[in-house]
């Protein structure tokens, strides 16, 4: 069977009826009844105007019953249902929750005050009160505390805890939503006020660290989501800055300086790179910085304290909220900065919005230029003594009446100013003396004894150690001689120049006539040169300012462009979201129409069912007065009617039980006087029983003491026998111990002998093993040497064989060389015969040409008449060159050609006219030109040699 759905307004009415009974059980039942409404799946479909009173009543019950977890879950469900349609309802519910929690805390405080005021002078313990485990534990832990603390822990502490949880829950509900951003800041302000009023330092740190900073980081991280926090909006940024400044003020009032410094960083992170911040807000920012950077906090914080005062005065003057004492604080804070270098802390410099690390000289010069005429006369005189004309011998006398006349607002700077005066005094003495006594320094500061600057020997030594450690002075203290020796420091780059200027000014002051006056023209030239340098510097500075202004304008235009782009993107997203929402609303309207049609159909069917049930008598209600009828609801009404009858029966039984309870109470009321009489009687009987028990215990103690004394006397008579027996037993035990020691010594000697034999045997075996290994190693070495000798012998035989083969090869080469020489001789003879034949043919041709009667053979068809061949010497190398080439080839190298282009063979030209027909001529024409070696030419010439038969 599905669970019965109860309409929210009916659940609210039922809860109010239960609360009207005024019992704890009825409160719990009313709370459970409302919890079922939040757990229903139809909760989000219920109108907000119906849900708001239900949520309000649910919050009231959560506050009364201390159900913070249920309150948080219920608020989350209500937020998810109402954040898109009715944000005002969420704000009203959150304010109501916090108001109820604060009212509960106020009621607890008033109740505690009444109980504390009603406490008697002597605390009375009521034994009739029931003992609770919580009260027992509380009494164990706060046993030493008074009744006031115990009452406050019992009443106020739970209310404070629940109030703090309500702030945390509401901040968690309203975070990261631009629609709930106003209520978020308001709740944060109320939480700060709560922490400040009740001194909840741990809760304040938890609020700042785990809630506000985390929510701001998430807002920047998820800025692209719908309804995200937009820090570019001036109003939103202003509200966030107001919250952070209130956080800073609360941290300062609670003296949580570390949390105040983190709050300063939060404010700086919000205002960094943004314009349009109010001057009053910035003045408040720097004023809180002055409280954090205390002047007496040391050198590293005093300089930032003075810089914060200077920045505060600038913005306060711009906002028109300058304090009368502000100028004096600016100048005194600058003068109170200790001498020496300042450690660079970029984090603090960034918090002050300064371009570089501030220094004492710059702060003093700026403060003197802007505020010297505004400060009181005594502060102005202190400035002149410390910075303009410091005289170590008279400074203390002049400063003594001035520091006593300072107003209370300037008193925090006196300890730091004292250190500055002592530093100036020691630096002035170091320039004049190499060593000075401590008594002399105390005499110089003696006029300050009746002032806050009183200095004794211990404080002076402490200051010397601190100044030397900081590097303000370089000195050593001789405690025996009670003197201070100043250590000379190496001169800096401008030391001689500074000394020369000082000497020049001193001489001019003592004897002006010794220095020649500067001529008017030189003075004008120097002035013109200085003016030109100043003009160039001003021009350079103007260019830098113009460039910076251009860069700032470019950055501003870039930021505006980015902002416009982001705005266009947000508008686009918003338009898309509106279109999507309109589409969803149209879809939802269609769904509602269909749902309404279905509902009407079900209602008609339910009316028919209700009529049938009424006719059967199972339903005893007016059907016409019931709305939203359906079959399941009718069955539920029937079940509810049965439950109602059962409840009426139980109510009658409860009334009877209540009557019996009243009778029991009346009986107990009547027997209460009798109980008091019985208590007095029982108390008297207990007193008598107590006295009797004490008397019996006293008699028993006396009897026990008497028996103990008798026992002591009896045992005392046996003491001598006991001592004798004891000595005999001890001597016997000594003899047994001696015998045992002797036996143990004998066994140890035997064990030593056995161990010695084992060691000797092991050493002998080790020695034999080493000898065996040495013999084996020597045998292996001998075998290796034999193998090496055998291998060397084989290599020698192989080398001899190679040498024999080389000799045989050399002999064969010599034989080939001899054969080649014989071939060359034969070729040379053949060449000579060819040349002789060639000359003879040429001579015959010449004779035939000159005589004209020589015989010529008839020319055959297809042949070419022979032509004269050139001389042999005109083509190719000589026979000597060909011989050298032949020798080179026989030596193993390739034949080297003496000419790059081939030369036709002389034998071919000589054999052309002596050919024996066309076949012979054609065969000779088909052969390629022989451009190879010489002996082939010779062979070709020999084959083509002309015959001498048939000559002239």
Swiss-Prot record:
Return the annotated region ranges for Disordered. Answer: 757-952
Q: InterPro entries recorded for this chain?
A: EIF3A, eIF3a_PCI_TPR-like, PCI_dom
Compositional bias (Low complexity): 798-809, 856-878, 893-918
Q: Supply one GO CC term from the record.
A: multi-eIF complex
Keywords attached to this Swiss-Prot or TrEMBL record, sorted alphabetically, are: Coiled coil, Cytoplasm, Initiation factor, Protein biosynthesis, RNA-binding
Instruction: Write out the GO biological process terms.
Output: formation of cytoplasmic translation initiation complex; translation reinitiation
Q: Where is the PCI domain?
A: 315-491
What role does this protein play?
Answer: RNA-binding component of the eukaryotic translation initiation factor 3 (eIF-3) complex, which is involved in protein synthesis of a specialized repertoire of mRNAs and, together with other initiation factors, stimulates binding of mRNA and methionyl-tRNAi to the 40S ribosome. The eIF-3 complex specifically targets and initiates translation of a subset of mRNAs involved in cell proliferation.
**Family of the protein in this entry:** Belongs to the eIF-3 subunit A family.
What subcellular compartments does it reside in? Cytoplasm
Record protein name field: Eukaryotic translation initiation factor 3 subunit A
């Amino acid at each position: 069977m599905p669970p019965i759905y109860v309409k929210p307004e009916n659940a609210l009415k039922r809860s109010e009826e239960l609360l009207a009974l005024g019992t704890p059980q009825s409160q719990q039942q009313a709370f459970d009844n409302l919890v079922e409404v939040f757990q229903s799946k139809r909760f989000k479909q219920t109108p907000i105007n119906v849900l708001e009173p239900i949520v309000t009543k649910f919050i009231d019950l959560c506050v009364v019953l201390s159900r913070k977890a249920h309150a948080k879950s219920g608020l989350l469900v209500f937020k998810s249902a109402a954040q898109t349609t009715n944000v005002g309802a969420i704000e009203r519910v959150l304010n109501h929750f916090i108001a109820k929690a604060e009212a509960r805390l106020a009621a607890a405080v008033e109740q505690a005050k009444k109980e504390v005021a009603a406490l008697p002078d002597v605390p009375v313990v009521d034994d009739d009160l029931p003992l609770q485990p919580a009260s027992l534990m509380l009494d164990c832990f706060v046993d030493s505390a008074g009744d006031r603390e115990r009452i406050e822990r019992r009443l106020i502490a739970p209310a404070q805890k629940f109030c703090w949880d309500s702030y945390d829950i509401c901040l968690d509900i309203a975070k990261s939503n631009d629609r709930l951003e106003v209520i978020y800041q308001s709740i944060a302000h109320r939480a700060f006020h709560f922490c400040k009023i009740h001194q909840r330092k741990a809760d304040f740190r938890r609020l700042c660290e785990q809630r506000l900073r985390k929510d701001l980081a998430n807002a920047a991280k998820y800025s692209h989501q719908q309804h995200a926090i937009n820090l570019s909006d001036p109003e939103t940024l202003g509200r966030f800055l107001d919250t952070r400044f209130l956080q800073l003020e609360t941290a300062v009032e609670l003296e949580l300086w570390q949390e105040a410094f983190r709050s300063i960083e939060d404010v700086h992170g919000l205002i960094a790179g943004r314009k349009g911040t109010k001057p009053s807000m910035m003045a408040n920012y720097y004023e809180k910085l002055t409280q954090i950077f205390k002047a007496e906090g040391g050198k590293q914080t005093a300089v930032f304290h003075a810089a914060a005062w200077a920045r505060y005065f600038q913005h306060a003057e711009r906002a028109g909220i300058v304090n009368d004492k502000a100028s004096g604080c600016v100048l005194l804070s600058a003068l109170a900065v200790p001498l020496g270098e300042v450690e660079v802390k970029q984090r603090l410099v960034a918090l002050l919005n300064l371009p570089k690390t501030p220094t004492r000289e710059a702060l003093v010069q700026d403060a003197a230029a802007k505020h010297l005429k505004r400060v009181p006369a005594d502060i102005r005189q202190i400035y002149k003594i410390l910075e303009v004309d410091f005289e170590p011998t008279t400074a203390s006398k002049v400063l003594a009446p001035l520091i006593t006349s300072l107003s209370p607002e300037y008193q925090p700077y006196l300890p730091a100013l004292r250190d500055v005066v002592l530093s100036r005094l020691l630096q002035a003495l170091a320039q004049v003396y190499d060593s000075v006594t401590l008594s002399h320094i105390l005499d110089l500061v003696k006029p300050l004894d009746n002032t806050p600057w009183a200095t004794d020997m211990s404080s002076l030594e402490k200051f010397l150690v601190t100044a030397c450690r900081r590097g303000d002075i370089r000195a050593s203290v001789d405690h025996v001689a009670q003197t201070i020796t100043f250590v000379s420091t190496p001169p800096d780059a401008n030391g001689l120049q500074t000394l020369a200027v000082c000497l020049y000014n001193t001489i001019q002051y003592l004897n002006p006539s010794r220095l020649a006056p500067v001529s008017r023209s030189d003075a004008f030239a120097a002035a013109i040169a200085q003016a030109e340098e100043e003009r160039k510097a001003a021009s350079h500075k103007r260019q830098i300012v113009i460039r910076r202004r251009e860069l700032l304008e470019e950055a501003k235009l870039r930021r505006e462009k980015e902002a416009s782009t982001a705005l266009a993107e947000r508008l686009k997203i918003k338009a898309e979201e509106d279109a999507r929402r309109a589409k969803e609303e149209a879809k939802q309207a269609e769904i509602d129409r269909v749902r309404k049609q279905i509902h009407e159909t079900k209602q008609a069917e339910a009316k028919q069912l209700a009529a049938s049930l009424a006719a059967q008598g199972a339903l005893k209600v007016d059907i016409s007065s019931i709305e939203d009828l359906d079959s399941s609801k009718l069955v539920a009404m029937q079940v509810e009617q049965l439950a109602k009858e059962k409840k009426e029966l139980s109510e009658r039984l409860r009334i009877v039980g209540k009557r019996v309870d009243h009778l029991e109470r009346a009986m107990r009321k009547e027997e209460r006087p009798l109980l008091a009489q019985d208590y007095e009687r029982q108390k008297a009987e207990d007193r008598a029983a107590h006295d009797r028990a004490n008397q019996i215990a006293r008699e028993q103690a006396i009897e026990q003491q008497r028996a103990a004394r008798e026992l002591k006397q009896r045992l005392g008579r046996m003491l001598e026998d006991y001592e004798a027996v004891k000595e005999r037993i001890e001597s016997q035990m000594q003899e047994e111990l001696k015998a045992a020691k002797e036996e143990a010594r004998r066994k140890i000697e035997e064990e030593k002998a056995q161990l010695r034999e084992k060691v000797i045997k092991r050493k002998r075996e080790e020695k034999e093993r080493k000898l065996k290994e040495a013999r084996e190693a020597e045998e292996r070495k001998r075998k290796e040497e034999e193998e090496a000798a055998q291998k060397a012998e084989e290599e020698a035989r192989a080398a001899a064989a190679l040498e024999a083969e080389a000799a045989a090869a050399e002999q064969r080469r010599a034989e080939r060389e001899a054969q080649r020489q014989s071939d060359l001789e034969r070729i040379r003879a053949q060449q000579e015969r060819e040349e002789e034949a060639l000359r003879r043919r040429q001579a015959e041709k010449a004779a035939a040409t000159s005589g004209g009667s020589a015989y010529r053979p008839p020319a055959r068809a297809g042949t070419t008449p022979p032509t004269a061949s050139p001389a042999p010497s005109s083509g190719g190398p000589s026979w000597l060159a060909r011989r050298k080439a032949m020798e080179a080839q026989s030596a193993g190298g390739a034949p080297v050609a003496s000419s790059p282009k081939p030369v036709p063979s002389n034998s071919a030209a000589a054999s052309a006219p002596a050919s024996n027909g066309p076949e012979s001529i054609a065969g000779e024409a088909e052969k390629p030109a022989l451009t190879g070696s010489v002996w082939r030419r010779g062979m070709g010439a020999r084959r083509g040699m002309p015959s001498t038969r048939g000559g002239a």
